[in-house]
Amino acid sequence: MHILLNLSLISVLFIGCQQIVQSNTNQNFSDILKNSPRIEGKQEYLQSPFSTTGNRVYMVGHQDGTFPDLGWHIEGEMGGIWNHPIKLMDGFDIQITEASESFKLNKADKFTNYPVANVHSFSWKDKKLEIERWQFVPDDKQGLVVQLIIKNHGKERNLNLKFTGHPDIIPTWLGDETGMEDGKDQSVFDSEKKLWKIKDDLNEWYALFGNDKETSVEKTSLNTLEDTISLKAEETYVINYVIAGSYTSEQEAYATYNDIKNNMNSYLTAKRERYEELANRSKLTVPDKDIEQVFEWIKYSCDWTIRTIPEVGSGMCAGLPDYPWWFSCDAEYALKNHMAFGQFETAYNTIHLLDSISEVTNGNGRIAHEISTNGAVFNKGNVNETPQFVSLIWDLYKWTGDINFLKRYFPTVKKGLNWVMTERDENNNLLPDGYGMMEIEGLDGEMIDISAYLQRAFIDASKMASEIGDNKLADEYKTKAIALKEKINSVFWSEESKSYGDFIATDEQALKTIANAIERAEDMKQPWVIEELKKKKKYIKENPSSEIRAFAIYHSYVVNTPMEMNFADEDKALIALETAKKFTSQFGVYVTGIDKDTREDTNNENVKRESAFSYESAVMPMNAGVLAVSENNYGRPNEALDYIKKATTTFSYAYPGGMYEVSPDFGMMNQTFNNYAYGVPIVNQFFGIDPQAAKKKVVIKPQMPDTWDNASLENVLIADNTISVYYTKSDGLLTLRVEQENSDWEVEIIIPKKDNINSFEVTKSSVEPEIVDGKYVFDSKASTTELVLKYE
């Protein structure tokens, strides 16, 4: 940005802000968070990103305390401090000086992340000074606080503190599409308020920064605050820098600045308490303590990625730093898990945002793919996203029982399914054409994930129609779902690949796709991929077919969607799940299976990314979630747990408390849909919680991994009820206790008389069971239901 100075105030631009002040005796951030969970980062990743987040403002820099250029959506501009739809600052520098010696806070000794804040720790060893740089963003505020805590373990010292801001007010990505024109920045010092004010000269866009000291004005430089302090031996000094902004008015920016300055401690306390409530909902206790920790922190990270712009909407964004806006596919995977964590408000808000923007953009039920924070749509929607949105509506209804919500969005459901079948199924064979999750050139035919998610969408839409009372439409949707199930199991199965195919096509179309794939592999320098693709090419030519058939060219993770959606024929499912294991690493599942180097003596675990942004050979935690869900659907919780463990290896690998988009340390430092490896497979499948809120009923059908012999899930929120499940298995006895807060609800517990390993016999129960289809069924409205079964 160019800096345009206000000449009427030029006299203050070289004037400093100095005053001798004593230690601030107010409670500091360290005190407020002393009992909060925290995770310390690794030394080798100090020069990698971190984020301090709020739903309005967030800050991205490096764990060492610097603010390098980051990101590619707006080249080099995705770091710094953002108040979407504008950026406020590139960052700031802090320097401490004694006499002629200076110490810059740009090489932290360590970085520690808390759920609601983070801290960089520095040590000026020659002066026996320890410095902590804290930062936190209050809820619903367009600003943040940077707090310095300086501890003097040496003699009395006079220190100069210099804070230099780097304002850079620019519009968000795609800003030009909504008339956001970037002007020049004007910086002036407000001598009355003792702060710097920066304004974009073409817009009412503002950034402010100052501190909480009564400073005077003399001798400084542009965008710099200076304070002189006297620090006695073993004394601690605290100073708070407040950064605020507005994209609407100067008045709003000042109001936010003063509000945060006057209430920062109470706002931090309130946010800490809110996060403690997040942790207490769906509280997991299991033998695998690593998974238990991830489960807790993944609930925090769901909140980190909420992006609220009142003029556009509020909802979960995809990830930081390059995806701080909204994606429907990410939401459709992630929000199922928000629901399992009791975070219904985020689900409601995100659905509303996606629906409203899609209606304005498309108007036909098609759900938009990517929406920037100014409301501009980059991609009107991949085909899979519309049926997945349909199922998302049903999922939230199951958790809340909110019939008005269902009625509000059912018109979108109907329009969306109609769009898929009339606009994307030209040959009327029930199998739509277009891009699905795999946005690779040539993969825009009849794709497996589109068909699989559509099959589930018809099932869910049928149930919605029944709830609303449209039985004719319910039957129509159900008929299509049954037909799709049969068709997918027939035409998408590839006996040669021992899995479902990426797509179905003619031999000619498949050979063209292989040619594209070989070209991609050549660009990515993957000789093993080229070798495998040539084998597939040879097989097709030697075994020609005049019929359309399935091809697993890329063997992408989406070939497992029939198992994820739980309609694959069991014999095919078990074969495909074994095949899927070939395309994994210690970190999880390859996005495109052929990217895995299957040659002998190849180390597929060495996957640290040093190159420019690319998804080459990507392994994602979310994909492990797809396989975990799939394994559970076919009664294989041990295998599901293996995938969860793989995903867990990425947690805190590079960013403490976070989980990278691409394992273990590439792409976004925190990607929301990674929660799919935890919420659904653990809450809905291991503990077997099936909410039916409209009926005031919850079905519990646990299928626990063998190693989880003592597990509990407490305070699971379902509409106006809260459920807790306690599971123990030892000495030949399985004990299950279910507690609920609302006795108006029915709890139905289902335990098989015999599973793959054990047979069960009821020895004690607070309610008498019925035996239905070879299963014990316990119905209860009691606040506590407990049963004991003998197994052998």
Predicted regions and their residues:
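Active-site core of glycosidic bond-cleaving carbohydrate-active enzymes
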Residues: P324-A347, H352-E359, P411, G445-A452, ...
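Active-site acid/base region of carbohydrate-active enzymes
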Residues: S191, L278-S301, F341, E345, ...
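Active-site lining segments of carbohydrate-active enzymes
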Residues: S314-W325, K336, N364-G381, E385-V390, ...
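Terminal accessory carbohydrate-recognition/targeting modules of carbohydrate-active enzymes
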Residues: C17-P287, M669, I689-E792
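Bacterial N-terminal signal peptides
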Residues: N6-G16
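Asp/Glu-centered strand-loop micro-motifs enriched in Gly/Pro and often flanked by an aromatic residue
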Residues: L70-E75, K107-D109, S123-K125, E132-F136, ...
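Acidic/His metal-coordination segments adjacent to aromatic residues that form catalytic metal sites
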Residues: T308, R366-K380, P432-M447, N606, ...
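Low-complexity, Ser/Thr/Pro/Gly-enriched N-terminal "stalk/linker" regions
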Residues: V21-S51, N203, S249-Q251, M264-P324, ...
